[in-house]
Amino acid sequence: MVFYLVGLGLGDVTDITVKGLNIIRRCKKVYFENYTSLLSFGFDQTQIEKFYERPIIEADREFVEQKIEKVLEESLNEDIALLIVGDPFGATTHSDLLIRAKQIGVSVKVIHNASILTAVGCTGLQLYNFGSTVSIPFWTDNWEPDSFFEKIIINLNNGMHTLCLLDIKIKEQSLENILKKRNEYEKPCFLTCSQAAKQIIKIIERNKGNLVVNADIFVVGIARIGWDDQKIVYATLRQLAFEVDMGIVHW
């Protein structure tokens, strides 16, 4: 029996490969991982099940982190698919799943698809000229991590571009709800290009005089790549932060 990691691409349900669709329709169970990314319409279980012609089980962060072992064990006796937006290896979480499955003797097959890691080529920037990819997290009132910025500077000094992946929060709990053990979740939220640019400018201001970069450096902002209304903007970091409206990232 096989545990399938099936990439769905970047747009909607129709972006799946023919191979991936055939696998979904013959698997005993099908799970949809919905916390590392989302399709253009969010997680609409009815729409997904109608197109794939299969019952779909939602796999949120809590499920993948705490209950996936049972799914892997079931894969020893039946074919199971985990659907992943983009390409299965676009997030380290899924690489870990592959390793864990192999450790208990589960056969794993991967069905690849489009990923933002390659689709960023739509900006006109050459993929060969990208350095390390970074993730920019949401800042809070008392937590402003900036370790990602060091990689941006290293790439810049080496004449390389940096792909910055912006944070998303899907079905997550507040610290208060976690401490009080309340099964309540925050509304989905997505870090925008504007917010990320403002955070970077704040980091630059903290290190004023020690950097060769400033808020007038040119950057490319991209949103909803692979969707019908994708947007690409070339502007200064300052313009992206305060003047450019990239629109909503998701619904």
What are these regions (language model features)?
Residues 59-61, 111, 222-224:
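Conserved beta-strand termini and adjacent loop/short-helix elements that scaffold enzyme active sites
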